[in-house]
Amino acid sequence: GGYGTMDVCATYPDRIAAGMALCGGCSYKDVSGLGDLPFWIIHGTADRAVPVKQSKVVVDKLVKDGKDTRLIYDWWKGANHGTPARVFYLKKTYQWLFSHSLSDKDRPVNRNISITMSDLGRAYGDVNRNAPQPELIDGPSVIKQEGNEY
C-alpha cells in the first residue's frame, strides 16, 4: 500500500524511476529519498483508515527540506480510503509512471499528466478484457541492458 510504496521509494530512490503512493505515510523519520525521484501522493480527505495527515506529514517534511521539486500531491476532498484505488485502472497512471526513467538527466517529474477524482468514472472503461496478454520480460536482463545494474 501507500506506506510500503513510500518506504521502498525513500530507501531506494536510485533504483526506482518513479513512484505513486495512495493513502499512505512513511515509516521513516528521514523521508528525503522521496525527493530524489518523481513521486506522486494521492490521499482522500475523508480517509478513516489512514488519515490524510499521514501523507501531509511527508509532504511537509519534503517542502521544509527543499526536496519537493519532483513531488506531486493531491488531497481529494471527500474521498475515503478506497476511492483512490481506481487510479490503478487508468491508462494515465501508467503513462505517467512509465514516462520516467532512471536514465533521465536530473530525473525531472512529468507534470503534463493530471489525474483527478473526475477521471475515476472512466477507470474501468480503460480495462479491455480482450486485449492481448502482456509480454513477459526478464527484469534482470532489462536492468543490465539499461546499465542500471546494482
Name each model-derived stretch.
Residues 60, 64-71, 77-150:
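Alpha/beta-hydrolase-fold serine-hydrolase catalytic core, especially in secreted/extracellular enzymes
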Residues 1-35:
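Primarily recognizes the serine-hydrolase "nucleophile elbow" in alpha/beta-hydrolase
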Residues 51-61:
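Short alpha-helix in the alpha/beta-hydrolase fold that links the catalytic acid
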Residues 46-51, 82:
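Acidic catalytic loop of the alpha/beta-hydrolase fold
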Residues 34-35, 40-43, 47:
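Short beta-strand/loop motif that positions the catalytic acidic residue
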Residues 17, 49-50, 66:
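Substrate-binding/catalytic groove segments of enzymes
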